[in-house]
Design a protein with these regions (language model features):
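Bacterial N-terminal signal peptides that target proteins for export
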Residues: 2-11
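Bacterial N-terminal signal peptides
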Residues: 10-19
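Immediate post-signal-peptide N-terminus of mature secreted/exported proteins
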Residues: 27-82, 161
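Short N-proximal segments of mature Sec-exported proteins
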Residues: 70, 85-103
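Short, solvent-exposed, charged loop/turn and helix-capping segments
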Residues: 97-116
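Helix-rich interaction surfaces within compact, conserved domain-sized segments
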Residues: 104, 115-163
């Protein structure tokens, strides 16, 4: 386990750096087509005739909270100090935020369809964090999804999480 922690920390650091660096994450860039291993849903996101999709207050509030939860968890995740129980609790919090977001968000149908792709990746990342062999990958997927959300949805003052 001691050998694994530095490897996981390095992997997370590299992934987070690429997810937060401008232009470093081609798989979630609005101009990118296809699938590059970060999750098919993110690769399928499209812009609204070259513009970001609209958001509403419920969406912005929910995504801001998801970002805050991830930001608060990054130090321990990056340090390899998150336990299985903590990852499960983090996954629960992601799912709870998604539940509230879905319940209260009211977007036009086309924007809602795009949001469902983002939600699918958030839930997939949360599920990955529950598995013994996918926790760090789940956290990385969530970080990349937050980055993609900002690329495709009009959310004033949206900033991706920096590591």
């Amino acid at each position: 386990m001691n050998v694994r922690k530095p490897l996981l920390s390095a992997l997370l650091a590299a992934s987070l750096m690429s997810a937060t660096a401008g232009g470093g994450l081609a798989a979630v860039s609005p101009s990118q087509q296809g699938h590059a291993g970060t999750g098919a849903a993110i690769a399928e996101l499209t812009l609204n005739d070259g513009q970001k999709w609209p958001s509403d207050a419920a969406l912005r509030e929910g995504m801001t909270e998801i970002r805050a939860i991830m930001r608060a968890s990054l130090g321990q995740i990056h340090g390899g100090n998150y336990s299985a129980a903590e990852y499960a609790a983090l996954a629960d919090r992601m799912e709870s935020q998604v539940d509230g977001l879905v319940r209260n968000c009211r977007l036009p149908p086309e924007a809602d369809a795009q949001l469902h792709l983002v939600i699918a990746d958030i839930l997939d990342g949360a599920e990955m964090m529950r598995k013994d062999n996918g926790r760090i990958e789940g956290a990385i997927k969530l970080m990349r999804t937050l980055h993609a959300y900002g690329d495709y949805f009009d959310h004033p003052d949206w900033h991706t999480v920096a590591n």
